[in-house]
Amino acid sequence: GYICLNYDTEAVDGENLSVPTSLEDVTGPEWRGKVALPSPVSSSPGRGFMLASLDYFDWQSDDGLKFSDWWSSMVANDVVITSGWTEAYETHYTGGYGEWTEGYIGDAHITVSYCHSPGVESYYNGNWTKSASLDIPKTSFFQVEYASAVSGGNALYAQKFIEYLISPEVNSMM
């Protein structure tokens, strides 16, 4: 699915923060230390968001902020870079279900997640969520996830596992 920025609507309202309408907005002082991004090195949503930021800033555009300038501004603005999606969403993000998990820190009101994460939050939380997707043009990335049996000595079990992954039983839980 699509990867995008998600934000905590209650925190934004409660702290009187402006809802970002551009990537430049989250480099401002009101968002200092309140953004958690999964590392593009170890996280596929992190990689997807990094690619979206490349597109957003037109890679090496001569007019205005460059992609690398934005990332440097985020570092200077105390962005929390995590080891992966789980740490960003469950440990740092205030708008998700992480607040009910062990190790929760809750210091970030914006994170990278799937654009459908707020819907999933609502589904499992009695049709209510405080999380929303940010609709900032050119900041989303479509990620395809797949499974494959490429080589090895257990082709039969690999095939059975893939059949299980695509079964109605598994997909009804997603």
Identify the function of each model-found stretch:
Residues 1, 31, 49, 107, ...:
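Residues that flank catalytic or metal-binding motifs in active/ligand-binding sites
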Residues 1-41:
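A conserved helix-loop-strand patch within extracytoplasmic ligand-binding domains
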Residues 3-6, 34-38, 109-114, 133-135, ...:
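Structural recognition of the beta-strand scaffold that forms the well-ordered cores
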Residues 6-11, 54-55, 143-157, 173-174:
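A bilobed periplasmic-binding-protein/Venus flytrap-type ligand-binding module shared by bacterial periplasmic
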Residues 24-27, 109, 123-141, 150-152:
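Short beta-strand->loop
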Residues 24-27, 50-54, 71, 159-166, ...:
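Non-transmembrane alpha-helical segments in soluble domains
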Residues 33-42, 164-174:
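Periplasmic-binding protein-like
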